[in-house]
């Protein structure tokens, strides 16, 4: 049985899974391959303790090992929904993003355990409507992406569409991280402007 996600602010102790060139948003899913020993240990610990972990992007993607200062300060509380064995001890994971979380303190050791603060999304205000309208315009020109996002959506939360767009649109990992760190209103504003800019570029305007 899955433990419910805590409501409101609060702190948790979670194993930390560093991400390379990837970012995970709440209400979105992410598939990735884990093959480094510390990361495999994180998966093992998470599987024994509620299948929850903090998925957080590395600042330097080429770093072989990621310490506290090598990680961005904001990541996502995630649940492991699937673990599949691969060759040479690697694992393929499926993660579901639950809530944004701020990295407060990392406890040392080969496997990092972090104290994290769960973050509130806040009020998206009028920017949410503008972002959804921009997403509708973009998806009107990309029926395949619209079908994909329909399949991926697993929440009726107002920010679900915006977070799915942040997760799956063709932008860089750095841009995704900036969106993850932004407040709900700022994220809506940025993704709305970005979607319209992408559409204009594709049309050659």
Please state what every model-predicted region is.
Residues 1-205:
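N-terminal low-complexity, acidic/polar interaction/targeting segments
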């Amino acid at each position: 049985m899955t433990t419910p996600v805590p409501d409101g602010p609060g702190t948790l102790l979670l194993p930390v899974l560093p991400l390379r060139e990837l970012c995970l948003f709440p209400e979105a899913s992410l598939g990735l391959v884990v093959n480094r020993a510390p990361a495999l240990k994180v998966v093992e610990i998470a599987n024994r303790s509620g299948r929850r972990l903090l998925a957080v992007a590395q600042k330097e993607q080429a770093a072989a090992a990621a310490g506290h200062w090598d990680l961005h300060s904001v990541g996502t509380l995630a649940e492991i929904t699937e673990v599949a064995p691969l060759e040479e001890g690697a694992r393929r994971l499926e993660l579901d993003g639950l809530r944004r979380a701020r990295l407060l303190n990392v406890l040392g050791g080969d496997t990092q355990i972090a104290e994290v603060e769960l973050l509130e999304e806040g009020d998206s205000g009028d920017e949410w409507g503008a972002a959804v309208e921009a997403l509708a315009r973009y998806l009107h020109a990309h029926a395949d992406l619209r079908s994909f996002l329909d399949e991926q959506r697993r929440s009726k939360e107002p920010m679900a569409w915006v977070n799915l767009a942040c997760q799956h649109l063709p932008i860089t990992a750095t841009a995704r991280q900036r969106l993850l760190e932004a407040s709900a209103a700022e994220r809506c504003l940025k993704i709305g402007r970005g979607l319209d800019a992408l559409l204009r570029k594709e049309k050659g305007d």
